[in-house]
């Protein structure tokens, strides 16, 4: 039995926030409907919600424009954050030394698809 499932995704790369912090927000919206996820993200107190909202809206726009799907019928099928390359900075220390500071980045991927027919 072959099922024709259309899945459309959007990716935000090199976001200046730790993947660990983004994952705790993505875990809350994975598997939910598009509208429900928007409401959840609007009222979460975390800084990671801003780039996730942007990627989610982009995925919905891609689904509407490229695949002809209806936004009201969308469900988040995949949502994950991969680690990106760290930004390396230096902190001056005493006696001419310098400590390296690694600022984390991540890549956020959100995929949406049509809700299964009941």
Swiss-Prot record:
Task: Report the Pfam families cross-referenced here.
Answer: Ribosomal_L22
Query: What S-S linkages are listed for this chain?
Result: none
Q: Does the keyword rRNA-binding apply?
A: yes
- Superkingdom, taxonomy of origin: Bacteria
One function term, GO molecular function aspect: structural constituent of ribosome
- What the protein does? This protein binds specifically to 23S rRNA; its binding is stimulated by other ribosomal proteins, e.g. L4, L17, and L20. It is important during the early stages of 50S assembly. It makes multiple contacts with different domains of the 23S rRNA in the assembled 50S subunit and ribosome. The globular domain of the protein is located near the polypeptide exit tunnel on the outside of the subunit, while an extended beta-hairpin is found that lines the wall of the exit tunnel in the center of the 70S ribosome.
Q: What name has this protein been given in UniProt?
A: Large ribosomal subunit protein uL22
Q: Which organism is it from?
A: Nostoc punctiforme (strain ATCC 29133 / PCC 73102)
Record gene name: rplV
């Amino acid at each position: 039995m072959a099922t024709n499932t259309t899945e459309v995704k959007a990716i935000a790369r090199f976001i200046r926030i730790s993947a660990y912090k983004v994952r705790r927000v993505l875990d809350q919206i994975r598997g939910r409907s598009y509208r429900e996820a928007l409401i959840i993200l609007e009222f979460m107190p975390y800084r990671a919600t801003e780039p996730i909202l942007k990627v989610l809206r982009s995925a919905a726009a891609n689904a509407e424009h490229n695949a002809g799907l209806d936004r009201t019928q969308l469900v988040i099928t995949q949502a994950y954050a991969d680690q990106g390359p760290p930004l390396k900075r230096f902190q001056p220390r005493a006696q001419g030394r310098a400590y390296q500071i690694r600022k984390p980045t991540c890549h956020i991927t959100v995929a949406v698809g049509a809700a299964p027919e009941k």
